From Swiss-Prot:
Role played: Involved in chemotaxis. Part of a chemotaxis signal transduction system that modulates chemotaxis in response to various stimuli. Catalyzes the demethylation of specific methylglutamate residues introduced into the chemoreceptors (methyl-accepting chemotaxis proteins or MCP) by CheR. Also mediates the irreversible deamidation of specific glutamine residues to glutamic acid.
Stretches assigned to the CheB-type methylesterase domain: 174-364
Catalytic activity: [protein]-L-glutamate 5-O-methyl ester + H2O = L-glutamyl-[protein] + methanol + H(+); L-glutaminyl-[protein] + H2O = L-glutamyl-[protein] + NH4(+)
Post-translational events: Phosphorylated by CheA. Phosphorylation of the N-terminal regulatory domain activates the methylesterase activity.
Keyword set includes Hydrolase: yes
Name this polypeptide is given: Protein-glutamate methylesterase/protein-glutamine glutaminase
Taxonomic source organism: Desulfotalea psychrophila (strain LSv54 / DSM 12343)
Record remark: domains: Contains a C-terminal catalytic domain, and an N-terminal region which modulates catalytic activity.
Location of 4-aspartylphosphate modifications: D56
Length: 364
């Protein structure tokens, strides 16, 4: 496999040096240069044609968002990994970057010592850059960066499930649960607006993200969707036609009200599962307790296997299941895990997922 050629773009000298040095320590990575603003980066991208850029958002002359806008007009443009700050403005701008097609983002560490900051950044960079290299080197880069709205329609595949308890009949779904990670904001931006306003069921979403960022994601999606989208709050009753996004850094599950009639959202500080908080497995297990034969579970783009164990529980209780296909995933990790485990009823491209969700709810 050839080296991944990376351009480092940041207006801070310290970060340009630290990121460049850390990247050079990763096997298979070649740092081809640095740039201190988007305009210089754009010139270097046209000249040197890197595979990937690490990109700061706030820069003089041309910021990271403006650079991403320009990259849309460049054939075979590089992927982008954003370096973001844990602030409201930082999260809002990061959501914009992800919607514009950035591969993922890394938080600029806020540890107690410079050494701890460097170690945290090294760990994040290594994981994301290695994943990008495996996903893109040897494939056309446009495969991972083309907006889903421009992807050509592909076939939805119905699968025979090996593990479902056939004694539990699948009925109309009364709740939809979604697990998603890397590539999620862009995928949700394309998929959720296709859900009709009269869907008539609640939708619960676990998107692997840190605190603050999930609130920005919910705000951004709410402006684009026919249904309401909000960050979930502890103790609220789930309502039809609302999508609830699990808060970053917390776990989200379903519980029963005191009278046993309503289903409530419970936000907890329970430990991470699969190194994730929020965790898809954690949510899915709880839904299985209250919606036997009446749930639809969706696994979308993301690295790792979070959601596999939880989906196994749901499928044993008669849930419908939908998996995103490999071609439309930014990272085919979570969907591959559940597909390999024989837990998916239907595999479909991103632009057909909403249609399949509606089918399980309406069963027409």
């Amino acid at each position: 496999m050839k080296n991944l050629r990376v351009l480092v773009v940041d207006d801070t000298i310290l970060y340009r040096k630290i990121v460049s040095d850390l990247l050079r320590e990763i096997p298979g990575i070649e740092v081809i240069g640095v740039a201190h603003n988007g305009k210089i980066a754009l010139d270097k991208i046209r000249l040197s044609k890197p595979d990937l850029i690490t990109l700061d958002i706030e820069m003089p002359v041309m910021n990271g968002i403006e650079l991403l806008e320009h990259l849309k007009d460049i054939p075979d443009a590089p992927g982008a990994v954003m370096l973001s700050t844990l602030t409201s403005d930082g999260s809002r701008m990061t959501m914009k970057a992800l919607e514009l097609g950035a591969f993922d983002f890394i938080l600029k560490p806020q540890e107690k010592t410079p050494a701890a900051n460097k170690a945290a950044l090294a760990n994040s960079l290594k994981q994301i850059v290695k994943t990008y290299r495996l996903r893109n080197i040897g494939f056309s880069r446009t495969r991972a960066t083309t907006p889903a709205s421009r992807l050509s329609p592909r076939t939805t595949i119905k699968r025979e499930i090996k593990t479902t308890d056939r004694s539990i009949k699948k009925g109309k779904a009364e709740i939809v649960v979604i697990g998603i990670s890397t590539g999620g904001p862009n995928a949700l931006t394309n998929m959720l607006p296709q859900i009709p306003g009269n869907i008539g069921v609640p939708i619960l979403i676990v998107q692997h993200m840190p605190p603050v960022f999930t609130a920005s994601l919910a705000t951004s999606l709410n402006k684009k969707c026919q249904i309401e989208v909000k960050e979930a709050e502890d103790g609220e009753a789930i309502q039809p036609g609302i999508a609830y996004i699990a808060p970053g850094g917390k776990q989200m599950k379903i519980s029963a009200s005191k009278n046993g009639v309503e289903r409530l959202i419970k936000i907890t500080n329970d430990p991470p599962e699969n190194s994730c908080r929020p965790s898809v497995d954690y949510l899915f297990r709880s839904v299985g307790d209250y919606f036997i034969g009446r749930a639809t579970a969706v696994i979308m783009t993301g690295m790792g296997a979070d959601g596999t164990k939880g989906l196994e529980v749901l499928m044993a209780k008669g849930a419908h299941s939908i998996g995103q296909d490999e071609e439309s995933c930014v990272v085919y990790g979570m969907p591959k895990s559940v597909a390999d485990a024989g837990l998916i009823d239907t595999v479909c491209p991103l632009n057909k997922i909403a249609q399949e969700i509606v089918h399980t709810v309406k069963l027409y």
